[in-house]
Amino acid sequence: MSRWPSPAKLNLFLYITGQRADGYHTLQTLFQFLDYGDTLTIEPRTDGQLRLLTPVAGVPDEENLIVRAARLLMRAASESDRLPAGSGADISVDKRLPMGGGLGGGSSNAATVLVALNHLWGCGLSEEELATLGLQLGADVPVFVRGHAAFAEGVGEILTPVEPEEKWYLVAHPGVSIPTPVIFRDPELPRNTPRRSINTLLNCEFSNDCELIARKRFREVDAALSWLLEYAPSRLTGTGACVFAEFNTESAARQVLDTAPAWLNGFVARGVNLSPLKQALL
């Protein structure tokens, strides 16, 4: 039995630069990981069975990203004669990341399954192959597979490794879940932010094109951001619902968390450029 980290991510900035004919939005964003997240426990099996021991209420196992990722790896490795006979697993997840929070929980779980099972089964797929598989599961999965902070373009799959400052963050959950399509389908969402170079963006004040829509449609997000902004620079991550404030020290972040109103759930974590999953493989 082995335990594998499935870390959260933050979008330190997020700009929507266009919309493709297939409906997907093109963007420019900066991904950084947190030293905080879910934990997957994986017990390899030799009878070919795949079991999720911690099902999610209302989500059939075969639709769960964890199971879908495992099946996808099984199929890809089998088709290239790299799946040892009888490969299977019992998988359980200790969830700390909220669904619909903008922290990448489901995508991170999928990436951890791909990376961990490839290692435990000895399939020998490359990082590039795993990232390509991950993209079939979601646009955010490849960055978790690669495990390095990155500037992302396209629909989020064109990644350039970067080294943003590793600050401390107070991440707050306003108590609502925001499905990504709710934000991306909003007619008022900016969809024509000019594309800029990495260097230009890294030297500008960071912001998120989705933030205004999230604040307008969800008063809880507005209230959380209004409270955080009293203490530090704060933004929405992804399409929400989580918001974060940045600090130079852990103690400063914890001091603010200690004064948080009862309706605001939060945690303090450090931004890291090498993900805990990547570190687990070193």
Curated annotation (Swiss-Prot):
Gene3D superfamilies: 3.30.230.10, GHMP kinase, C-terminal domain (3.30.70.890). It comes from Klebsiella pneumoniae (strain 342). The active site is at residues 9, 140. The keyword Coiled coil does not apply. It catalyses: 4-CDP-2-C-methyl-D-erythritol + ATP = 4-CDP-2-C-methyl-D-erythritol 2-phosphate + ADP + H(+). Belongs to the GHMP kinase family. IspE subfamily. The keyword Repeat does not apply. The lineage of its organism: Bacteria, Pseudomonadati, Pseudomonadota, Gammaproteobacteria, Enterobacterales. This is 4-diphosphocytidyl-2-C-methyl-D-erythritol kinase. GO terms for molecular function: 4-(cytidine 5'-diphospho)-2-C-methyl-D-erythritol kinase activity; ATP binding.
